[in-house]
């Protein structure tokens, strides 16, 4: 059986605790994959260009 493609997610929040909670929750989902995290929009922009997340 072919597995569906996982949705790649970049988690962006200024709080390290919130990033950790979101990363753990998203990672628990079979169809989602956290490809990175960022603490601000400037770092997020660089990571979006490099990692090409879906969300």
What is the role of each PLM region?
Residues 37-55:
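Acidic, metal-coordinating helix/loop segments flanking the phosphotransfer/catalytic sites
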């Amino acid at each position: 059986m072919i597995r569906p493609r996982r949705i790649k997610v970049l988690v962006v929040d200024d709080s390290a605790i919130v990033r950790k909670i979101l990363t753990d929750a998203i990672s628990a989902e079979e169809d989602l994959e956290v490809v990175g995290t960022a603490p601000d929009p400037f770092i997020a922009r660089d990571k979006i260009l490099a990692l090409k997340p879906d969300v």
